[in-house]
C-alpha cells in the first residue's frame, strides 16, 4: 500500500492535473482499497497494447498513461529505420477522441507525423491505413467488445498486424524509463495540425479500404440484391463502412436497429457489446421478429467481429456461433473457388488452437493446408505476412477464430467485420439460390463430418487479489494434471508454455480427453478472466452438447467457482 499511496500523493500534487482525474482522486481519499487498485501497478503493456478501466491512476486508462505509452512508442520508432509516420483511429468509447488526440500530440512532438482519421472508424480501417500510408506503426484507441468502463490502446506494426512480442518488449522497455508527468513531450494540437505534423486522413483512404473489401468477392453475387438484412453496429463504428459495402454489393433491403445505430460509449442497450452474446443481439432479434429478414448481422464497437442470426424454420431466429460461421465460410470459399477455377496452388487457411477441430477435416476435403496459431488474430496476420515474404500471399484464402473474427484477403492484417459482412452475405445468397439457409449449411457440415460442438466458460477475477488467484490457479493446474475431467480420462496434456509445441510459448493448457473431446484453459490477454474452451464431438448435436454441459461443470470446479 505504501508505494501506491506515494504515487497517489504525487499525482494529486501535480500543479496542472486534469480536473476529472483530480476529482476522482479526491473522491477516494482515505480509501486504501480504492487507492491500491488504481496504483498497485502500471497498466500492463503487451502485444495487445494497453487495456483497462477508464479513470485515475497508473492502473487505469487516462491521458497520462496514454501519453506515457505513446512516448515509449515514439522512442522505439525513432530508434528504428521504420518510417516516422503513425496512423491513428478510435472507436465510440468514452475518451476515445481525447486519447487519439493526445497520441497525435506526443508523436508530433517527437518528430513523427501523426495521421488521424477525422471521425471514428473500424479497427480494420486502421490496419489498412498503416499499410496504405506507409506508416511505421499504428494506434487504435479501442477496447473492442469490453464493457463501457473500459478503453484501450492497440499498437500495430508497419505490416498492419498488431505488434509482435519482440516489438512489445522493446516498446515496454522504453515506456518503463518514462515519467508520465515529466518525461513526455507534447505539442499544441491545433498548432501541429496547422504545420502538418498532424494530418487528417482523407476520404480516399477509407473509400479505397471499402473497395479493397469489395474486391474480396468470391462468387458471382447472384441473388445478393434480394437479401433482406437487419444490421446493428452496437453503438460503435461499423455503420459507415458496412453501409458503403452493402451499397456496392447492391444490398438495399437493410434495416438498422434504431437504438444501436448511433455511436454511444455507454452502450445503453447492452452492458457487454459483444456479438458473441445473445444479450447484445437481443434488440436485433426483436426487430427480426417484426421485419423477418434473411439475416441479422451485428458488428462490435470497433467493427472487427461479426455476429449473425438466421431464420430457424420455426418462426424464430438462431444465432450462428463463431466456429460455425468460420466453418460455413471456409466451406463456401473452398467450394466456390474450386468451381470457378480461382483456387490458388497450395492454398492455405489459418485458424487458432482454441477454434473448432472440425476445420481440419473440412480443409482436408478441399486439399487446403490448415495452419493453427496461438490465440489472437495477429498470429493469423503473421502467417499472411510469411506467405507474402515468400511471394505467395495469394495462397492465403481464409482465416478465422472462434471469437467471431474472419478475414479472406491480405488487404488488412486483422480480423475485419466489413470483410465478414461481404462473405456472410455472399454465402447466404448462394444458399438462398438453392432454397437453403446458413442453418442448412452448418447442419449439412455436421452430418458430413460429425457434430463438433464448442462452448466457452469465462471466470472473472477482479483487482489485485484476482490477478494472484489467476496465477495460482494456472500454477496448480500445471503442477497437478488431472487424471480425468467430467469422467473422461485425460489421454494427454499439452502445456503451451514450454518448448516443443511448434508455436511461441503461451500461458495455455490443453487436455485431450477420451472420446475425442478437449478442454483448454487460458487466461484472457485483455480482461481479468480465465477462459476455458470446451470441445466435444458426438453423433448428434444433443449428444455433443451434453458432453459440453458436463465439461462446463467440471470447468467451474477447476476454477473453484
Please give the residue ranges for each predicted region.
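Glycine-rich phosphate-binding loop plus the immediately following alpha-helix
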Residues: 156-186, 323-347, 351-362, 417
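N-terminal small/polar loop signature for handling phosphorylated ligands or for N-terminal nucleophile
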Residues: 87-150, 248-308
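An N-terminal, well-structured beta->alpha segment
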Residues: 3-103, 110, 192-193, 198-226, ...
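Conserved phosphate/anionic-ligand binding catalytic regions in large, soluble enzymes, centered on
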Residues: 39-59, 143-144, 229, 233-245, ...
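Short acidic, glycine/serine/threonine-rich loops at helix termini
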Residues: 97-102, 127-131, 149-155, 176, ...
Amino acid at each position: 500500500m505504501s508505494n501506491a499511496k506515494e504515487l497517489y500523493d504525487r499525482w494529486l500534487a501535480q500543479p496542472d492535473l486534469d480536473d476529472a482525474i483530480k476529482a476522482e482522486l479526491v473522491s477516494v481519499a482515505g480509501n486504501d482499497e480504492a487507492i491500491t487498485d488504481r496504483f498497485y501497478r502500471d497498466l500492463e503493456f503487451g502485444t495487445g497494447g494497453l487495456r483497462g478501466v477508464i479513470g485515475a491512476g497508473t492502473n487505469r486508462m487516462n491521458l497520462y498513461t496514454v501519453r506515457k505509452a505513446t512516448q515509449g512508442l515514439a522512442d522505439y520508432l525513432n530508434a528504428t529505420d521504420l518510417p516516422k509516420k503513425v496512423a491513428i483511429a478510435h472507436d465510440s468509447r468514452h475518451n476515445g477522441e481525447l486519447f487519439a488526440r493526445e497520441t497525435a500530440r506526443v508523436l508530433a512532438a517527437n518528430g513523427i507525423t501523426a495521421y488521424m482519421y477525422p471521425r471514428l472508424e473500424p479497427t480494420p480501417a486502421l490496419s489498412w491505413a498503416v499499410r496504405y500510408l506507409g506508416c511505421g506503426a499504428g494506434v487504435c484507441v479501442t477496447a473492442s467488445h469490453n464493457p463501457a468502463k473500459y478503453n484501450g490502446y492497440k499498437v500495430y506494426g508497419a505490416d498492419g498486424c498488431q505488434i509482435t512480442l519482440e516489438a512489445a518488449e522493446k516498446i515496454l522497455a522504453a515506456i518503463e524509463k518514462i515519467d508520465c508527468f515529466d518525461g513526455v513531450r507534447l505539442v499544441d494540437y491545433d498548432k501541429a495540425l496547422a504545420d502538418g505534423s498532424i494530418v487528417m486522413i482523407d476520404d480516399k483512404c477509407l473509400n479505397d479500404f471499402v473497395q479493397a473489401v469489395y474486391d474480396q468477392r468470391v462468387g458471382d453475387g447472384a441473388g445478393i440484391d434480394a437479401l433482406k438484412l437487419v444490421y446493428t453496429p452496437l453503438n460503435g463504428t461499423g455503420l459507415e463502412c458496412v453501409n458503403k459495402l452493402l451499397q456496392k454489393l447492391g444490398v438495399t433491403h437493410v434495416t438498422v436497429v434504431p437504438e444501436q445505430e448511433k455511436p454511444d460509449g455507454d452502450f445503453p442497450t447492452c452492458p457487454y457489446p459483444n456479438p458473441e452474446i445473445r444479450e447484445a443481439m437481443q434488440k436485433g432479434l426483436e426487430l427480426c421478429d417484426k421485419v423477418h429478414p434473411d439475416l441479422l448481422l451485428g458488428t462490435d464497437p470497433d467493427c472487427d467481429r461479426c455476429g449473425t442470426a438466421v431464420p430457424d424454420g420455426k418462426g424464430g431466429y438462431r444465432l450462428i456461433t463463431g466456429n460455425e460461421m468460420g466453418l460455413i465460410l471456409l466451406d463456401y470459399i473452398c467450394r466456390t473457388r474450386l468451381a470457378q477455377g480461382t483456387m490458388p496452388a497450395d492454398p492455405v487457411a489459418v485458424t487458432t488452437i482454441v477454434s473448432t477441430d472440425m476445420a481440419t477435416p473440412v480443409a482436408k476435403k478441399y486439399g487446403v493446408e490448415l495452419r493453427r496459431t496461438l490465440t489472437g488474430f495477429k498470429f493469423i496476420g503473421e502467417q499472411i505476412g510469411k506467405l507474402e515474404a515468400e511471394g505467395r500471399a495469394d495462397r492465403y484464402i481464409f482465416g478465422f477464430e472462434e471469437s467471431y473474427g474472419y478475414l479472406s484477403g491480405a488487404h488488412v492484417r486483422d480480423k475485419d467485420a466489413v470483410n465478414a459482412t461481404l462473405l456472410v452475405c455472399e454465402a447466404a445468397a448462394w444458399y438462398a439460390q438453392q432454397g437453403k439457409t446458413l442453418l442448412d449449411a452448418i447442419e449439412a457440415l455436421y452430418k458430413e463430418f460429425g457434430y463438433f460442438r464448442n462452448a466457452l466458460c469465462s471466470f472473472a477475477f477482479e483487482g489485485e487479489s484476482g490477478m494472484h488467484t489467476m496465477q495460482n490457479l494456472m500454477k496448480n493446474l500445471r503442477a497437478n494434471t488431472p487424471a480425468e475431467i467430467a469422467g473422461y480420462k485425460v489421454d494427454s496434456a499439452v502445456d503451451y508454455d514450454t518448448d516443443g509445441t511448434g508455436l511461441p510459448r503461451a500461458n495455455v493448457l490443453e487436455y485431450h480427453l477420451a472420446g475425442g473431446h478437449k478442454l483448454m484453459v487460458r487466461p484472457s490477454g485483455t480482461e481479468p478472466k480465465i477462459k476455458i474452451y470446451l470441445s466435444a464431438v458426438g453423433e448428434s448435436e444433443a449428444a455433443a452438447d451434453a458432453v459440453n454441459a458436463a465439461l462446463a461443470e467440471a470447468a467451474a470446479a477447476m476454477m473453484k467457482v
